Amino acid sequence: EDLPHVDAATNPIAQSLHYIEDANASERNPVTKTELPGSEQFCHNCSFIQADSGAWRPCTLYPGYTVSEDGWCLSWAHKTA
């Protein structure tokens, strides 16, 4: 099943969590959380991501949608092994 991509402009959850699709090209929260600085925080290394690979992956914070592996939001939490 192909899920739609979350739209930061229209999705209220994405808006409240300041989701950005490309964290490399956007300004984001520079605060260091855990051991990673803001510049190293992405959806692909977040504990909420639900797949190990893919450019767009399901996220527990955005039910029914996928997020960009290079995205970021305020709820980012470091994914541990």
From Swiss-Prot:
A Gene Ontology biological process term: aerobic electron transport chain
Superkingdom of origin: Bacteria
Disulfide bonds: none
GO molecular function: 4 iron, 4 sulfur cluster binding; electron transfer activity; metal ion binding
Binding residues for [4Fe-4S] cluster: C43, C46, C59, C73
PROSITE patterns with a match to the protein in the record: HIPIP (PS51373)
Keywords, ordered alphabetically: 4Fe-4S, Electron transport, Iron, Iron-sulfur, Metal-binding, Transport
InterPro entries: High_potential_FeS_prot, HIPIP_sf
Pfam families xref list: HIPIP
Gene3D superfamilies: High potential iron-sulphur protein
Family in the record: Belongs to the high-potential iron-sulfur protein (HiPIP) family.
Protein role: Specific class of high-redox-potential 4Fe-4S ferredoxins. Functions in anaerobic electron transport in most purple and in some other photosynthetic bacteria and in at least one genus (Paracoccus) of halophilic, denitrifying bacteria.
Assembly: Homodimer.
Protein name, as recorded: High-potential iron-sulfur protein
Organism: Thiococcus pfennigii
Organism lineage: Bacteria, Pseudomonadati, Pseudomonadota, Gammaproteobacteria, Chromatiales
